């Protein structure tokens, strides 16, 4: 009996310790020292200890002469400019004064043991990991994290090279959410004259909660410039430049230690009372946890049963009638999705598209329109689209089309995306009136490669697009590419999976997928090779496939392509040939393609400049 009680007590204590999960410790100037390699000091990033592995996070960036506009700052952090404009009460054309704090929204995810948000960055002359981390990004990354992420030394960097920059961010722990109601964490870079109290006041947060979030105390609260702290927020941050700092909080009151008991026997008796109370309290907590797990288990079983029934109906060709009242689309969406996306009313979409008339149609089930004066692309989807909505809400990258909201009406979903004002890539490369320069074409190819690399290596979990083609790539006002149509995307944590359901666009599908149903990231690499060939030749995929099937060599196809200078033909040829190899194991990864295209683009820019 004693042994059982002892083990029960140990189990309770271990269980309760999970509720005291440490927050993120502030480690001071260790993060600014490139010589530090010990990860116990969090030099690679904050720990992945949040309740959710992916969450909405924010960082503060101070405008500089090089990054002073909404557009330039958004481009630096690979986020949508409209989000930056909205958070900072600024118009898209706003230019911030030097030093002004700008709120940047990011999707924070776990990469191994580290919590981070990955962005892409083009190396400038005289750049180093130290300069990028501490100057350009103002301490929001570290030398060590950059070297680890890119597996390249600082000395090997060259202008025009594209690298991945992990931004320091974190997701709230279960303790923060349950005890303090924290929903977001914002990474803030300390500057001279800053103190925890001053920073907390600026964002309307109690100093004690900021100290707690960074495992600090009133006695040990010194902070250093170019280091980051986390600001715990209950609501999304407001425009910091319009906030009026609240009065400073009163100094902490010292708590006197309890007087020692003059009677040792009473003290001992109290100790047993406290121990018993602790055991009973722990048992109560475990009971609550057990009940919660039981309820969730029952709910999951019920959900699985409903899904199996739904799948059977779908297989039999049945589509049960639905109404907005009978089916709540929010049931299939995560809480973060509901908070981050706008749920539109159907009449809003009718008004935006003139009641879905042909004049607003862009082919298939797609439409364009204006909602509150802003351009939008609206896609109608029959059946359940909650999985696609959940996926798109997790992605936050400059080269992935952004989902801004959705609508559910009479059994159909309507997804509302950001408007890519220059339409699809195919409209620009398959017509004789194309005005794209060679540099623009290669930049578009690099954007596509970067977007796929994000899906393959930085999304959590990784995804394979499965239907990449020139119709599914869209161009914004500045002809930067954004990958869309992720309805066929499939998550994969393995090197490959097999499927019996082959889908996609003819001319872009890899041999192993068509023949064996093998799905891997190399499926997207093959499709990317076809798109790259389309970009540099102006020919459609079906025509290119016919030429390749007839035995025409890639170099011969490229020679008859448009605008490609002779000196660069061999480099592009090698890249295309590698991407289109029949054996998927011999194709390059997308991060290798990003590196190759970065070099090709840099060489092309030099060639174009010298030809003027």
UniProtKB/Swiss-Prot annotation:
PTM field: Autophosphorylated; induced by chitin and derivatives.
UniProt feature, compositional bias: Pro residues: 244-261
Enzyme superclass (EC): transferase
EC number: 2.7.11.1
The keyword Cell cycle is assigned to this record: no
One GO MF term attached to the UniProt entry: protein serine kinase activity
Spans traversing the lipid bilayer: 276-296
InterPro entries linked: Ig-like_dom, Kinase-like_dom_sf, LysM1_NFP_LYK, LysM2_CERK1_LYK3_4_5, LysM3_LYK4_5, LysM_dom, LysM_dom_sf, Plant_RLK_LysM
Binding sites annotated in the UniProt record for ATP: 289-297, 342
Pfam family, one: PK_Tyr_Ser-Thr
Annotated disulfide bonds: 48-110, 55-171, 108-169
Entry comment describing in which tissues the protein is expressed: Expressed in roots, stems, leaves (predominantly in hydathodes, apical meristems and stipules) and buds.
Compartments (UniProt record): Cell membrane
UniProt entry keywords in alphabetical sequence: ATP-binding, Cell membrane, Chitin-binding, Disulfide bond, Glycoprotein, Kinase, Membrane, Nucleotide-binding, Phosphoprotein, Plant defense, Receptor, Repeat, Signal, Transferase, Transmembrane, Transmembrane helix
Binding site for chitin: 125-131, 154-160
Side Extracellular, residues: 23-275
Active site (UniProt): 467 (proton acceptor)
Induction, as annotated: Moderately induced by chitin oligomers (e.g. chitohexaose (6-mer) and chitooctaose (8-mer)) and flagellin (e.g. flg22).
Membrane topology term: Single-pass membrane protein
Chief place of localization: membrane
Functional description taken from the UniProt entry: Lysin motif (LysM) receptor kinase that functions as a cell surface receptor in chitin elicitor (chitooligosaccharides) signaling leading to innate immunity. Recognizes microbe-derived N-acetylglucosamine (NAG)-containing ligands. Involved in the resistance to the pathogenic fungus Alternaria brassicicola and to the bacterial pathogen the bacterial pathogen Pseudomonas syringae pv tomato DC3000, probably by sensing microbe-associated molecular pattern (MAMP) and pathogen-associated molecular patterns (PAMP). May play a role in detecting peptidoglycans (e.g. PGNs) during bacterial growth.
Subunit structure: Homooligomer. Binds to chitin oligosaccharide elicitors.
Protein name as catalogued: LysM domain receptor-like kinase 4
Species for this entry: Arabidopsis thaliana (Mouse-ear cress)
Organismal lineage: Eukaryota, Viridiplantae, Streptophyta, Embryophyta, Tracheophyta
